[in-house]
Amino acid sequence: MRRPRRLRSLSAHSSGFTLIELLIAMMILGILMAYLVPKIPEAIEEAKITASRKNLSDIYQGLTTYQAKFGRLPSESGVKFFAVLISKGVWENTKASAKKLTCPGVDIGALAIRDLPPEEWYKDLDAVNGDYSAYAGRNCKEYPLRNASGKDCWIATDNDPEMNFRTTTLVLMGDGTTDRLEIADLQEQGVLAKDEEYLQVGPDSPYE
């Protein structure tokens, strides 16, 4: 005759956690929360910086396509410098294309385009102004572009009225590279004072 299997004891033993096991699990969870939660905002911002760099890379490719189509680089200034990608048909006027022309570090609600559908943002170049994007385009009126050069700044996160990212400014150069400027580095280089935590973009910028 088979001996009865003692399933009841096994079932009872595995029916739940003991108090000690629960306390240990809660302690481990607390440690993980204390370590990970403060890093979540940093991780989110870094993801937005990566997305912004991708936008700038795509814009550069668009501007080189513009040059191939029209035999020159755009002569417009500010946001219009890159808004021509949509207004002149280099890019298809879609929501995805329009969203590439502004920095993901700044909420759309802070811009003049907040109440417009994306397909209307850059369709009419005459309506576009500096409040239509969180990127600052080159001032081609005072600094015209003739050829692509790694020494020329084309587009940057505009930092207007405050930093797009907490400590980071991105600058698209004429050779397609994107420079990452950090406040701490600029302080060490003497570009900013030790207590300055804001980098102005534009003609009055301390960074050349």
Where in the sequence are the language-model features?
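N-terminal leader/signal peptides at the extreme start of proteins
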Residues: 1-17
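Acidic surface patches and DE-rich sequence motifs
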Residues: 13, 137, 173
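N-terminal single-pass transmembrane signal-anchor helix
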Residues: 13-40
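Conserved hydrophobic/amphipathic alpha-helical signal-anchor segments
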Residues: 34-100
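Structural recognition of the beta-strand scaffold that forms the well-ordered cores
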Residues: 67, 74, 100-104, 155-156, ...
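Short catalytic/ligand-binding loop motif for oxyanion handling, primarily in non-cytosolic enzymes
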Residues: 67-68, 74-76, 81-85, 109-113, ...
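Acidic, glycine-rich loop-and-strand cores that form catalytic or ligand-binding grooves
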Residues: 92-153
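C-terminal accessory segments of extracellular proteins
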Residues: 154-208
